[in-house]
Amino acid sequence: MKIIDAHHHTWDLSVFPYSWMNDPHPTGDISHLKNNYLIDDLLEDAKNLELIKSVHIQCRGGINSPVEETKWLQSLSDKQGFPHGLVVYSNFLRADIEKEIEEHCQFKNTRGIRYLLNYINNDPINSFAPKEVLINNTFKKNYSLLEKYNLSFDMHLWWTQYNYAFDLIKSYPNILNIINHAGTPQKRDEEYLSNWRNGLKTLAQASNTVL
């Protein structure tokens, strides 16, 4: 069976700093990730599968020049054939972001943008965003630019934010949204899972959303 890996990461610690590797993480100890993971590693892990294409999701984040990562990933693709699509990073809380989006789009494999949305008030470990950005006017203005550049948006968020996300998604029906990591469920108790399931059902009402 032919497979497209729709969400993977590649990093080279000799090329970029990855500050998130040193931050407290909701999943606990991630020290085992502090090794390079390159295209050859991806292909080795998939050697028993018919992997025909892949989509790389940004993994530097929180940096001043995110286009550098896009340029690097495009060079990997040009040399090794993977990845085929790039979901890149831009800080959607910046007012002057359009020029950076244009720079990302100079690289032929650019397909979308991800800005981590996860936020829980007074819970810094579980908050990747500095505030609830889904209701922020600067964020909404930048999000609207995706239609102009024919880019998708990867949504990484908690179920408590699904209603905000749904309102945004419905306001821009021509922007495709990809819900990351099955909507990032955190707990296994039935009340939590029920809220998560019901939230996904709400998001599923929008035809411009995929999981």
Label the predicted regions.
Residues 129-211:
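Catalytic pocket-lining loop regions of alpha/beta-barrel enzymes
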Residues 39-44, 70-74, 97-102, 139-143, ...:
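Generic structural signal for well-ordered alpha-helices
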Residues 8-10, 57-59, 87-92, 114-117, ...:
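A cross-domain feature marking catalytic cores of carbohydrate-active enzymes
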Residues 2-5, 52-55, 83-87, 110-114, ...:
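Structural preference for beta-strand elements that scaffold enzyme active sites
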Residues 60-61, 115-134:
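Glycine-rich phosphate-binding "P-loop"
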Residues 1-74:
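An N-terminally biased module of ancient metal coordination in phosphate/nucleic-acid-related enzymes
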Residues 64-79, 165-178:
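Short, electropositive alpha-helical surface patch
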